Amino acid sequence: MNDFSRSISDLTPERVTTAFDLAGHTTARSLGVAQGIVVRSRSIVGSFGAALQTIFGGNITLYTSLCEKARQQAFDKMLADARKLGANAIVAMRYDSTEIGSGITEVICYGTAVQVTRNAGA
C-alpha cells in the first residue's frame, strides 16, 4: 500500500525516531536532512535569578526551562522543514547544542526526512 499522497499530514511527533528505521514501516525514499535551529540568549534578569539558585545548589530551573523551550522550538522547526520536503517520517533524529557567545546558545534538531509505507499486518 502506497500512502505517499498523505505524507504531509501524516508527519506527527509519533513518526519521529532516534532509530534508523520506523517500527512497522519500510523506508521507501530518503529525502535528505531536515533540521530546525534556534538561537537563544539569557536575559539579565534570568541570569541573576539562576545565579541565586546556584547558591542553594540543585536543579537550576530557569535554565532548565530555557533549554526545554529551545529544544521544543528546534524540534517543531525540524518537523516543518521535513514537511516541506514531503516527508511522512523522520529517522535518526538528534539534538546538538553549542555556545556561540557569552550567554548565547544554538540548539539544532536534525534527522533524515523519509517517506515510509506501513508494513502489511502492522
From Swiss-Prot:
It holds the Pfam family YbjQ_1. It comes from the Bacteria. PANTHER family: UPF0145 PROTEIN SCO3412, UPF0145 PROTEIN YBJQ. This is UPF0145 protein BamMC406_5002. Gene3D superfamilies: Hypothetical protein apc22750. Chain B. Belongs to the UPF0145 family.
